[in-house]
Every structure is written in structure tokens, then in C-alpha cells.
């Protein structure tokens, strides 16, 4: 039996559904790696406003009792997972219930904001500690793209409805004034989502009689807002579940005659439109396909016409470091995805297209608050997930995903922009 296959099962976890979570790495290599990881944990806690609290009641780290605490229930299992699998192991350990925190987002924000200064480059918390290479597949073939989308967006419309607002919008909202009101209430989220959509439609010049293409439908709110302006909109998606519910929502709003929602890869769309809009879709394209994605945007908008996209970004050097590896997010949440950097978007549009960037507006603090509201809503309704067929491991996975994402925006590790581009050439 090899070191890699010698593992101890974790109790009460479905090993068929969660094979990696159900097994704790065993053997001499795992033990040696665990010793290093344990020293790293303790070293990190002494340098950060963070407390590590162990199952025997001992604690290390910040002296301030107000500092966020990470409760370690199975220290050896956590260390073995981190030692062998880095961030993936850290996430799988949370999924297995081996550690927890009453202030999960604060813990992750502290770690995210300090990786470059406190942890050696090969041991960054928010990157793989030991390189885990991505599964090999062709350059995001159409079949692979459909499978990647289905893993996340076809989970269940009821799951997303449990924590999204009435607009069923699954992207960064735009609140009125976060300086005056830094923690908006849940009741403000739907209006903030419509405000975000309206800004995109404004910069895209969508008005009465416009012919608009949307790449990435979501659940149809942008279609509804565009049609309410008198525009005709075609929207394409790879999600069967999203297409079904989006069509229902559009019909219920009375705009079925103005909106067409197709199950179609963006690479197969033809024709030209007055404007093109795409909200947080580039993240799923895959970095090898980014030039093709922007070339498609250029080809699909009329000469002189606007393109409006919303995109989550990460620092350029971290994007380069992670593009050939697999992270916990890619393994469990968004397979095949990668966040671009602002530099990548600027370089690709400049080198591969005739699209000219005319505006880029950051909404970073808005995304932190959007994710906070989603996370709080998700936790309020967490107990109902079992009725949808999702177990406790899934619930912990999604709690970590939402908190991890919120921490990324709060720490500045992640950003999100609304970009306006114009296709150069005579109208």
C-alpha cells in the first residue's frame, strides 16, 4: 500500500460522494508533512491577530481575546491534510468538521490579507501549498464547458433561491452609499442588484429598439430590465436549470415577445448586435480561451458599438502562479475556472482585438457586502438543505465558499470591475 492510498476514514462522511474528504492522509510522508504544517500553523498565529484554540483547551496566537479564533477539533487530521494538499486540504478539513470558527470570514480575511508577508511563497494559505495540477482536458471544449457549468449552476434552482434575493441575481450588487451605510440590510439587496444591472445597461447604451446580446443568462433579471426599456435581447447560457427558470421569469414579467434565451455556447453565436453585455462569465471561460472570448465580443457587436462586462479579478502575479494548478475552489465549486487579472484583460483586448477600454469601475466593497448578505441568508436557511438532497458536508463546503469569497474582497485579494469597451471602427 502506497503512502498516498494509506488513509484513515473520517467518521460520518459519505465516502462515495466525498472520497477525498472522507479520508485523512496516512503514512510517513503525510506525517512529515503534517509536522511542517503544524509548525506553520503555530508560526502564523504568532504573527497575526488570530487565535488557534485546540480541543484540549490550550490556545496559541494573539493575546487579544477579541481576535478571531480558529477552533481545531482534530489537530493531526488538519495538519496532515494541509501538509499533503495545501489549501485543498485546508478546505477539505473544514468540510470534514475538523476545524471551525464562529467568525469564519474574519479568520479567512486575516489569512488572505497577510499571505505575502508571513508565509513562504510555496506555502501561501490562499494558494496550493503543494502543487496540485489541474486535470488535463482540451482547451475548454464545448462539452467540457457544459459539464463545468452544470457542476455549479445546475445544482438546484431551489438551492440558489434559498439565499438569493427576489431578482435571483448571482453577481455583485451596487449599493447606494457604503461610506454612509457600510453594512446594508437584506431588504436593500434587490434594489442594489437592479442598480448594478441598470448601470451596465446604461454604459451599453441599451434603449428602446436596441438589439442586445447577453452572454451568460443567470436567472434572467438583466433580460427583464433590458426588455422593460423596450430593447430586444438574446441571451445565451449553458445551464439547463437557469434557462428553464429564466424563461419562466421573463414570461411572468410579460416580456416573452422581446426576449430569446437559448442554450448555446458563446462561440456558436452569430450575427451582430447594437451592444453586448456579459456579467461575471469570463471567470468560467478558462485562461486559454480568454483571447477567443474577447474576440467573440468584438465580432458580435457592431463597429463603434459598446461592450459592457462585469468581471472578478485577482492580482496578476497570483493569476500566473495559479493558472496551471488546481485550488479548492476549482475542485469543489467552479471546475475549469480561473479569475483574470486586470493586466490580463488589458493585454488581451489590446493585443488580440479591436476593442478599446473606455472605463473600468471597481465595485470591490460592494461585493464584500453582497457576499455577506448571501452568507447570512444561507446560514439562516442552512437546515433546509437536507430536504433538497444536500448533506452536512455540502453545507460546510458552501459556507466556506461564501466566507472565503467575502474574505477575498475584504482583504483586497480579489476585486470586481465593470468594464466598458468600444469596438473601434466606423459605426
UniProtKB/Swiss-Prot annotation:
GO molecular function: methyltransferase activity
Name of the protein in its database record: Tuberculostearic acid methyltransferase UfaA1
Pathway in which the depicted protein is active: Lipid metabolism; fatty acid biosynthesis
Activity regulation statement: Inhibited by S-adenosyl-L-homocysteine.
pH dependence of this protein's activity: Optimum pH is 7-8.
PANTHER family xrefs: CYCLOPROPANE-FATTY-ACYL-PHOSPHOLIPID SYNTHASE, FATTY ACID C-METHYL TRANSFERASE
Function: Involved in the biosynthesis of the tuberculostearic acid (10-methylstearic-acid or TSA), a constituent lipid of the mycobacterial cell wall. Catalyzes the transfer of the methyl group from S-adenosyl-L-methionine (SAM) to the double bond of oleic acid in phosphatidylethanolamine or phosphatidylcholine to produce TSA.
Gene3D superfamilies according to UniProt: Vaccinia Virus protein VP39
EC number: 2.1.1.-
Taxonomy, superkingdom: Bacteria
Gene Ontology BP, a term: methylation
Enzyme's top EC category: transferase
